[in-house]
Regions:
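A generic secondary-structure signal for well-formed alpha-helical elements
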Residues: 26-30, 76-81, 85, 100-112, ...
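Single, functionally critical "micro-switch" positions that shape active/binding sites
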Residues: 70, 74, 93, 114-115, ...
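Juxtacatalytic substrate-recognition/specificity segment
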Residues: 1-89, 96, 100, 162-163
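Acidic/His/Gly-enriched intrinsically disordered linker/tail segments
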Residues: 88, 92-176
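Short coil/turn segments at secondary-structure boundaries
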Residues: 33-37, 116-117, 192-195
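An acidic- and aromatic-residue-enriched active-site/binding cleft used to recognize and process polar
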Residues: 39-41, 102, 132, 195
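Amphipathic alpha-helical substructures
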Residues: 4-5, 30, 158-201
Length: 201
């Protein structure tokens, strides 16, 4: 993955931070190497961040690289170590990925807003969306489909989902469900359950 405005040292620090966080929470990657390419990210981008034009940069370059790398690394990590049916059980991959992305943001960037630096501009101060936390974007994008009555069950096979649900809404819904269960049960039970699930599969 590349971010032209970052030095090699900044990239290495971001990669190290993400890899250590995932190893600490999901376990060490069992193989000697993992490939994380720009093409992987482009196939499965973080919607919201990737749709903004280059001249509007509400987030710092190092933050953008870190979040993009986190999403892509988690995706490749989970698809390599979990032996699930990618058609029927795709929501499990997506749910674990989004759940740990939410936890990562809560751990390292709890004050980051969904609109980034735009939240500091006086012109936008009166809008609720500007004050929304970064993790609120998952529920906003999921609810976009739910309010249009186009929500589909997570148990539906991947090939039966409409495009928006396949690419965005179902992924975010799965992650939000795991995060909700974590909040409801407490005691890091969900994190431990995910670790056990990965070990068993």
């Amino acid at each position: 993955m590349h971010e032209k405005r970052l030095t090699d040292i900044q990239r290495a620090l971001a990669i190290d931070k993400v890899v250590n966080y995932i190893a600490e929470n999901l376990g060490n990657y069992p193989f000697s190497k993992i490939t994380v390419a720009q093409a992987d990210y482009e196939r499965n981008p973080l919607y919201g961040l990737s749709q903004l034009p280059r001249f509007i940069s509400p987030f710092e370059s190092d933050f953008l690289f870190e979040i993009k790398f986190l999403k892509t690394y988690l995706n490749n990590y989970l698809h390599t170590i979990l032996k699930l049916d990618p058609r029927k059980d795709n929501w499990i991959y997506d749910g674990i990925q989004i759940y740990w992305m939410i936890k990562y943001m809560e751990t390292f960037y709890p004050e980051t807003k969904m609109m980034g630096n735009v939240a500091q501009l006086k012109l936008f101060k009166g809008y609720n969306i500007v004050s929304a936390d970064f993790n609120d974007q998952y529920s906003y994008l999921y609810l976009l489909m739910a309010r249009k009555n186009l929500d589909q069950p997570l148990s539906n096979p991947k090939n039966t989902l409409i495009r928006f649900n396949d690419k965005i809404a179902s992924k975010y819904k799965a992650g939000l469900i795991l995060n909700y269960l974590d909040s409801y049960i407490g005691n890091d039970y969900m994190a431990k359950s995910i670790q056990d699930f990965i070990i068993l599969n």
